[in-house]
């Protein structure tokens, strides 16, 4: 395992000790791969995913520009916020999953905030 991945796993564990999703305020978790970005809203008490969205979602499939991953992350953030609003989820706890709050991760978070999620 490379040192970047080891460092991210350490940051992830350090963050997860402090961040926990509840039924009233579930956790918005972000996963980033080299091509795609995924977001899911998780209730850690019951261990269930309440909502999910990614660049592979059917709602976004045709509207994404493959060259601009930051714009794709913004669309995923707006989509996850819209899905949460439909399911009466207004407040979440943001889990950046060990990634730096920069680039695609911050773009997703800002778009979700602008679309009405509170965190």
Curated annotation (Swiss-Prot):
Task: Give a Gene Ontology cellular component term annotated to this protein.
Answer: cytosolic large ribosomal subunit
Q: Which GO terms describe its molecular function?
A: 5S rRNA binding; structural constituent of ribosome
Keyword flag rRNA-binding:
yes
Keywords, A to Z, come to: Ribonucleoprotein, Ribosomal protein, RNA-binding, rRNA-binding
Protein role? This is one of the proteins that bind and probably mediate the attachment of the 5S RNA into the large ribosomal subunit, where it forms part of the central protuberance.
Give the superkingdom in one word.
Answer: Bacteria
| Protein name according to UniProt | Large ribosomal subunit protein uL18
* Taxonomic lineage: Bacteria, Pseudomonadati, Myxococcota, Polyangia, Polyangiales
The cross-references to InterPro entries, in alphabetical order and at most eight, read: Ribosomal_uL18_bac-type, Ribosomal_uL18_bac/euk
Task: Please state which protein family the record places this protein in.
Answer: Belongs to the universal ribosomal protein uL18 family.
PANTHER family attached to this UniProt entry: 39S RIBOSOMAL PROTEIN L18, MITOCHONDRIAL (PTHR12899), LARGE RIBOSOMAL SUBUNIT PROTEIN UL18M (PTHR12899:SF3)
């Amino acid at each position: 395992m490379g040192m970047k991945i080891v460092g991210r796993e350490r940051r992830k564990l350090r963050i997860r000790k402090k961040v926990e999703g509840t039924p009233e305020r579930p956790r918005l978790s972000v996963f980033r791969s080299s091509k795609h970005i995924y977001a899911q809203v998780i209730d850690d008490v019951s261990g269930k995913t309440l909502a999910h969205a990614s660049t592979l979602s059917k709602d976004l499939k045709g509207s994404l520009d493959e060259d601009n991953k930051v714009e794709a992350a913004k669309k995923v953030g707006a989509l996850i916020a819209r899905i949460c609003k439909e399911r009466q989820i207004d407040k979440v706890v943001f889990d950046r999953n060990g990634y730096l709050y920069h680039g695609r991760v911050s773009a997703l978070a800002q778009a979700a905030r602008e679309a009405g999620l509170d965190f």
